[in-house]
Curated annotation (Swiss-Prot):
The lineage of its organism: Bacteria, Bacillati, Actinomycetota, Actinomycetes, Mycobacteriales. InterPro entries: Ribosomal_uS2, Ribosomal_uS2_bac/mit/plastid, Ribosomal_uS2_CS, Ribosomal_uS2_flav_dom_sf. The keyword Transmembrane does not apply. This is Small ribosomal subunit protein uS2. Keywords: Ribonucleoprotein, Ribosomal protein. GO terms for molecular function: structural constituent of ribosome. It comes from Mycobacteroides abscessus (strain ATCC 19977 / DSM 44196 / CCUG 20993 / CIP 104536 / JCM 13569 / NCTC 13031 / TMC 1543 / L948) (Mycobacterium abscessus). GO terms for cellular component: cytosolic small ribosomal subunit. The gene is rpsB. The keyword Phosphoprotein does not apply. CDD domains: RPS2. Residues 257-277 have a biased composition (Low complexity). Belongs to the universal ribosomal protein uS2 family. Residues 255-277 are annotated as: Disordered. GO terms for biological process: translation.
Amino acid sequence: MAVVTMKQLLDSGAHFGHQTRRWNPKMKRFIFTDRNGIYIIDLQQTLTYIDKAYEFVKETVAHGGSVMFVGTKKQAQEPIAEEATRVGMPYVNQRWLGGMLTNFSTVHKRLQRLKELESMEQTGGFEGRTKKEILMLTREKNKLERSLGGIRDMQKVPSAIFVVDTNKEHLAVAEARKLNIPIIAILDTNCDPDVVDYPIPGNDDAIRSAALLTKVVASAIAEGLQARSGLAGGDEKPEAGEPLAEWEQELLASAVATTDEASAPSAAATETTTEEG
């Protein structure tokens, strides 16, 4: 069974790229056409690349690896936290702090400080201190929690990272590349595919698209964890969105018809506009 369907991708708006004046020419091979000044991403390729990324993530986790989720733009923050938490993986959905990967030993010391402050608060360690001292310690704890809470249990650099919007997360991408950590990423039409090991061509600005593709990666992790523990079971499938427009229904029908002749459905195209972050 497919990891994700053409209809789910269409429902989420994954096919909408950026305006044609805002693009990276290196993404040309992933573009199907353009409509009303908006590039339309080739979802047939998206399905193929999703399968490749899914298999890589599943095998990485099955063999004991971990995947860090990175997405600090507003549209990605909630799904990044929810899906990473669902499968027990580290995540960054606030500001990326320089050195999170390349200087992890220092970051790990800050994590120890966070746990120390939390322990003090829970075991009465704040008692006997002045109100000013308690306020300063609480502020320090809250600041560390906000910036490092998603990686609080990370003991070493991850085996791979999953990124929503490689342009916005260029610092994370640069650090991962410096350490030769594989990068899985949603690639919109304004991104550079050369910096990514496992690209997933798609809309990284729409909330539903980012959520769907993040959920797919988390499901690959869940399956990898099951394989690691010797358990059998299927992955959780992403949910479909709102009803398709008539032209999208025709596109879907065309893709379904093509399935009998090829291994993957064909992608076609669109009107409307994209949500841009």
